[in-house]
Amino acid sequence: MSDITMTLAEVSNLAAQIRGQVGKAVVGQTATVDALLTALLAQGHVLLEGPPGTAKTFMAQCFAASLGLDFSRIQFTPDLMPGDILGSNLFNFQTSQFTLTRGPIFTELLLADEINRTPPKTQAALLEAMQERRVTLDGTAHALPANFLVVATQNPIESQGVYPLPEAQLDRFLFKLLVPYPSAAEEAKIIANFGSHAGPPRPAQLGVEKVADAAMVAAAAQAVKSVTLADTVIDYI
């Protein structure tokens, strides 16, 4: 546990800095970025649903870059197996012992790209991790970082070769966000800003800088827990 503490004013300032960094690379989508920040501070997971070309994957990459968190990306495909996500215990012939080979889920911010393109058996590999922030392999539980956050994406247009997420999986997400197409003005700005790039730029190429670290993110989430929730608000919810 970090010894760093933050006030709510400092949390607000940090959130503004993160918005600013993501805004250097992502045109528009401010509501989506705000929801990502909310989920981060509430320690919940996010499902981004939108058509191709709405910067879902790139937005998650920029978000991770600004936070300074460990980042992994898994491209979900029909042949992806649970072990490709979680890892496995492999026998070491030199030591005659099993050695844990950690999968990409052992990170702080996991981008589960096109999560609905993999079968339910593989989707289920995320259930324990998202609910309990741990992974069990061969009967042994392995803790995930306190800041563990899953940002998943899916394309609602495709109907061939996709596997709709079951209710148990959807329940693990705090938010399902519908990512819209950019406006005409935003599209013009995207062309002006990125039209000269031969391929998709990286966040660092567009000036996205780290403004936080794991300890700061944990402290910010802890500070948010101090907000008083009035009974009238509870009744409204």
Question: Where are the regions a protein language model picked out?
Answer:
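Pre-Walker A (pre-P-loop) alpha-helix and adjacent loop at the N terminus of AAA/AAA+ ATPase modules
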Residues: 7-51
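Canonical AAA+ ATPase core
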Residues: 92-97, 118, 122, 130-229
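Conserved beta-strand position immediately N-terminal to the Walker
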Residues: 46, 110, 148
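P-loop (Walker A) phosphate-binding loop of NTP-binding proteins
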Residues: 51, 85, 153
